[in-house]
Swiss-Prot record:
Residues 204-230 form a coiled coil. It holds the Pfam family ARMC9_LisH. GO terms for cellular component: centriole; ciliary basal body; ciliary tip; cilium; cytoplasm. It comes from Mus musculus. One of its GO terms (biological process) is cilium assembly. Transmembrane segments: none annotated. PROSITE patterns: LISH. Residues 637-659, 761-817 are annotated as: Disordered. This is LisH domain-containing protein ARMC9.
């Protein structure tokens, strides 16, 4: 009761203000009379003086009238008296408008005075404007838009000065008047809001929910920031340690040139600094530093990822009930279910847990891909609800990120047709289109779907989309260019491009100079591929493509320069390369890239948020849709070409951007444990297995780059020296290789052709090793494995397996005599 008495005057004032605002005139009179009878004081300054609509209109009319008549004093008296200072001093729109209003009154006599204007009055207005510029208007002096007008008071005849030509056009004053009227309407409408209504809005249920959501997001952001900070500090410390050790090793190598020996004690001290903590204690007892190869074996063993605890499987679900609610439920329920199903897939641990989730979706035909009913889950892609359409596209994109998911979606062409239709129709929701495009790009890893997309004219749609790349998000740009490149790898795709050769070449040449450097490998790949068609080469020469490319050689980095040089070589070639297949349009499934790329963009910018007490995510699934034994295991399909290729077939493998968008590639689940895959996603991938140089001979293609086996052209066996096969591979992430010129090994006399990755991914995680640039003059000496003398014990060959603790990094060269 004491609190009420302390604030009784303000509370009664709020009620009076609201009754006045709502025009309850009789009620207001009765209320005021009763307050007076009871001796209750009414606060007169609750929310400032209440401006009723009628009074506001009068003020607005007076301001506009003063504007029209050029009455500067009357206008600014009303302006300063009725526009709150908080608005005039802090609102950028109000400040800009006031600046132009001062210009209007300063030049009013010059524009509207018949005959010669009164010099004294004109000087007075110019002086007033000059004073404004030196005081309040000085805040805008650094703005480019207003900078020329600071010279206005000093120009003898502004009407003929080119800088002020716009001010004296007939349209300038009406446009300024319209801006003034809009500003006044918004300002006085805001001032009319009673404080009681403002308090209600600020403390309503929506505000509480919003505050709760913001608080939750803040907590999560702080938690992630701390995690990333710890990772960063560890990576930085490891980097500094590595640089220090490298510097010492360089000094030691220089010393050995002059004949100085390296002692075992020094080698031991270096290895101790490189080994992980768990091995340092036993290092002195387990490593014989006098025997070559022992230390390197122990070092590689120390870098092997630790085994983590087994991850439990997620509970089974009632998929019949799930699909029923996805078809017949409310739009909000559909959106939450689609979100939860996606989260179950994207947040599961790579390996058995994720495979079990995926196989449950497939075996229960979650999306009704095999259903012929009129209403199916797939139809949600064309829902009237924006949230449902977007979340359906996100789920399909997540499924397409996994090899088995792509196989499930590809078994029925209606999924592809629906995605193509949604892609061309979706013009409202950017995220929906991004996810549809991402799914189609991943579909392009499969040859039958490539063929279907080429036949459907998707290349023409992509070319039209990429004509204005600055209007596209980074995701849309990268995935559309990567999709275009994948389709251009096929003969049918190249022939499609030949129909619009001029436009295609113009779009690609424009993309070469785009600020998003992530698209460069795909642009170069597409350009190199289509230039194998003679008609496109002729068109490129006619438009001066070589000069355009040489401009980028001057500005690009070494990798970009190397790629462009080979494109120029292709451009200037007269005949098709030897060894080109007559047709690459067979539909064999062994072109499938059997890899999984679950990029972080799948869960970005969630459109819906649960209200208080509303279930979402895994809690929604396990509370309302718990099932019995619907998680059925199934062995992963392993195509013979998923790991290696025959010597007769050229490397023609499509790629997807997702692998390097997430920072580092994710290892194939069937090749590594779920613990290792999770560490790879977290940026803890320690070593990247590459191929043995002894495994390859001339003309025998294999796997290059970041563990990929992808190429973008037909090639001569003698022109290209591939890097060979790889027993266990990483996810293909846009790694396409270029050969270097032949050099002679000075130590052996053998002719050596190096194969260096030109179209290679750039891992963004410092712990992921990058490809080493090799010197042609020292081809044999640059193997990452240690070199041994003939007298000492030799290191045994180690298979390049991710599961092996004795993995080795060997140079990817092919040597021919």
């Amino acid at each position: 009761m004491g609190d009420i008495l302390a604030h009784e005057s303000e509370l009664l004032g709020l009620v009076k203000e609201y009754l006045d605002f709502a025009e309850f005139e009789d009620t207001l009179k009765t209320f005021s009379k009763e307050c007076k009878v009871k001796g209750k004081p009414l606060c007169k300054n609750v929310g400032g003086p209440l401006k009723k609509d009628s009074k506001s209109l009068v003020i607005q009319r007076d301001l506009v009238a003063a504007f029209d008549s050029g009455d500067q004093k009357a206008f600014f008296d009303l302006w300063e008296g009725h526009i709150p200072s908080s608005v005039r001093d802090t609102d950028s729109l109000a400040q800009k408008l006031e600046f132009y209003l001062h210009i209007h009154f300063a030049i009013y006599l010059l524009k509207y005075c018949r005959g010669r204007p009164d010099k004294q009055e004109l000087d007075k207005r110019i002086s007033y404007f000059k004073t404004y510029l030196e005081t309040k208007g000085a805040a805008l002096s650094q703005t480019t838009e207003f900078l020329p007008f600071y010279a206005l008071p000093f120009v003898p005849n502004p009407m003929v000065h080119p800088s002020f030509k716009e001010l004296f056009q007939d349209s300038w004053t009406p446009e300024l008047k319209l801006k003034l009227e809009k500003f006044l309407a918004l300002t006085f409408k805001a001032n009319n809001t009673p404080k009681l209504l403002t308090i209600y809005k600020e403390n309503g249920p929506n505000s509480k929910e919003l505050l709760q959501q913001l608080h939750q997001q803040l907590v999560e952001a702080e938690r992630r920031a701390m995690t990333y900070l710890k990772r960063y500090n560890k990576i930085q410390a490891d980097y500094h340690n590595l640089i220090g050790v490298t510097a010492e090793l360089v000094d030691s190598l220089e010393a050995t040139v002059s004949g100085k020996m390296i002692t075992p004690e020094y080698l031991q001290s270096v290895c101790v600094r490189l080994f992980s903590n768990q091995m340092r204690q036993s290092l002195a007892h387990s490593v014989d530093f006098t025997r070559p190869g022992t230390a390197s074996t122990m070092l590689r063993a120390s870098l092997a990822p630790e085994k983590l605890k087994d991850v439990p499987l997620l509970p089974s679900l009632d998929y019949e009930k799930l699909k029923k609610d996805l078809i017949w439920g409310s739009d909000r329920l559909k959106a939450f279910l689609l979100q939860a199903l996606r989260w179950r897939l994207t947040t599961s641990h790579p390996g058995e847990q994720r495979e079990t989730v995926l196989q449950a979706y497939i075996s229960n035909d979650l999306l009704d891909c095999h259903s012929h009913n009129q209403r199916s889950v797939l139809q949600l892609l064309h829902s009237k609800s924006e949230a449902v359409r977007q979340y359906m596209a996100r789920l399909i994109n997540a499924l397409a990120s996994l090899a088995e998911g792509r196989l499930y979606l590809a078994q029925n062409t209606k999924v592809l047709r629906m995605l193509e239709g949604r892609l061309k129709e979706e013009d409202k929701d950017v995220i929906t289109r991004e996810n549809v495009l991402g799914a189609l790009q991943k579909f392009s890893l499969r040859r039958p779907l490539q063929t279907a997309m080429i036949r459907d004219g998707l290349i023409f749609w992509l070319i039209d989309l990429l004509k204005d790349p600055d209007c596209l998000s980074d995701y849309t740009l990268e995935y559309s260019v990567a999709l275009l490149m994948n389709l251009c790898l096929r003969s049918a795709g190249k022939n499609m491009c030949a129909k619009v050769a001029g436009l295609m070449l113009k779009v690609l040449s424009d993309l070469l100079g785009h600020e998003n450097h992530e698209i460069q490998p795909y642009v170069n790949g597409a350009l190199y591929s289509i230039l194998s068609i003679p008609s496109i080469r002729e068109e490129a020469r006619a438009m001066g493509m070589e000069d355009i490319l040489r401009c980028f050689i001057k500005e690009g980095n070494a990798e970009m320069i190397r790629q462009i040089e080979f494109i120029i070589k292709q451009l200037n070639s007269e005949d098709l390369l030897d060894g080109v297949l007559e047709s690459d349009d067979d539909e064999d499934e062994d072109d499938e890239e059997d890899h999984d790329i679950m990029e972080a963009d799948l869960d970005k910018d969630e459109l819906i948020q649960p209200q208080l007490g509303e279930l979402s995510g895994e809690k929604l699934l396990t509370t309302e849709y718990l099932g019995i034994m619907t998680n059925t295991g199934k062995a992963r399909r392993k195509g013979p070409a998923s790991v290696q290729w025959s010597g007769d077939e050229p490397l023609r493998r499509p790629v997807t951007p997702g692998g390097h968008r997430t920072g580092c590639p994710v290892l194939g689940d069937h090749l590594i444990s779920p613990q290792n895959a999770q560490q790879a996603r977290n940026g803890c991938l320690r070593a990247m297995p590459v191929a043995h140089p002894d495994d390859y001979k001339e003309g025998k293609p294999g796997v290059t780059g970041c563990g990929t086996s992808s190429s973008f052209m037909d090639h001569k066996p003698r022109e290209w020296s591939p890097a060979g096969h790889q027993k266990s591979r990483l996810v293909p992430t846009a790694a396409l290789g270029w050969p270097r010129e032949m050099t002679q090994d000075p130590s052996s006399g053998h002719i050596t052709r190096e194969f260096v990755p030109a179209f290679t991914c750039k891992p963004q995680v410092p712990s992921t090793p990058e490809t080493v640039e090799q010197n042609p003059l020292k081809a044999k000496a640059l193997s990452l494995a240690p070199q041994f003398s003939s007298s000492g014990p030799q290191q045994a060959s180690r298979p390049a397996s991710t599961a092996s603790s004795t993995r080795g990094l060997h140079s990817s060269q092919s040597i021919r005599k």
